[in-house]
């Protein structure tokens, strides 16, 4: 259990949270108040409605803002710089054209989904998004199709990789808490991840992409429409994209390789996500900037323009994080878990429901994973279950922690801001995609548990 900062009365907290979320939706959708202001107002309403003392509420809001931005500011900023160079230089255009040539327009989204799945096992969701989303925009611009046709497979791949397949932080975290061997987790997680990508990424993107087209983001800069011969080479662009991913992966696996104590600190430093992105930006500036004929002043203008939307993106993410922390510090997660423990439902289903309810109420996937895994690990008899059954439980927990992303989740606002979608579009596309990932994880977990 995560001890709350303020132990709110359960009934009062549930009412305050429900009214606060309704208030948030009304402020944004009906009264057209900016999401940043609406999020903070709703967070304050929930805290005061739950009876949280004003000094504690102020401290929670400040902590929520700081902890939400911690580690993500540099990722978003550096990712924007990287994406700006990749886009204006024609690098994204080159990759988009190559994917279309190799897979055809109808299968380029599948290629992006597989790319996201692989990348999602090695990096956090936010880092993968900011590195790879320019490729989806490039494909959408080239084919004139809805951006969702390409972005949804990419996002689904990243989400499923993070949730189900080691060495991702999400799958390793819960597997360790339930004492699941990572080899077994990989054997169970890979097919679950592939099925989740199929349903949430490939099939859902075709459905929603034919119905919603948010258009290309307004900050997409004008790309020099050149002949393919004048574009940077596919190999060059691919290598630059892979550099931060390989560095992050090397940092992750170095912890499991004996006899490299001398170089491990170097690998860990270079594999720190923001360091890896700095290296990628510098490589992009030279190979996609200077080598493509851009001078220093032109590169500066490209970088300046690519950073313009990041302030609003970060503020919206912060607002979502503040709501999450207010709910968490009031003890929302500790209300949900014990109630379901006594329900008598199958353990895999209980695991999913605990994680899903915490995810829906608190917003943060990792918090939902941690709290649900802690509750399940403490339940009688869980330690005696078979390794495969426990791996199925990991899939159910992480599926529940992925599903039902909405206005209290910073990821909801990150995706909505990057794609410049309003809240209705984000709910219809992103929230549904995340929920399909989660339900697929549950169904697979239940089926596997029957044979474990």
Model-flagged regions — what are they?
Residues 2-11, 187-301, 419:
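Long, contiguous bundles of hydrophobic transmembrane helices that form the permeation core
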Residues 11-15, 54, 66-72, 99-114, ...:
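Membrane-interfacial loop-to-helix junctions in multi-pass transporters
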Residues 16-28, 40-49, 76-83, 116-119, ...:
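Hydrophobic core segments of alpha-helical transmembrane domains in multi-pass membrane transport
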Residues 30-35, 69-72, 83-93, 119-133, ...:
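Short helix-coil transition sites and intra-membrane helix breaks within transmembrane domains
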Residues 37-40, 44, 60-93, 269-331:
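Core transmembrane alpha-helical segments of multi-pass membrane transporters/permeases
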Residues 50, 87-92, 102-106, 139-150, ...:
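Juxtamembrane helix-boundary/capping and inter-helix hinge elements in multi-pass membrane proteins
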Residues 100-188, 361-399:
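Hydrophobic transmembrane alpha-helices that form the pore/transport pathway of multi-pass ion
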Residues 103-106, 193, 347-452:
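C-terminal transmembrane helix pair
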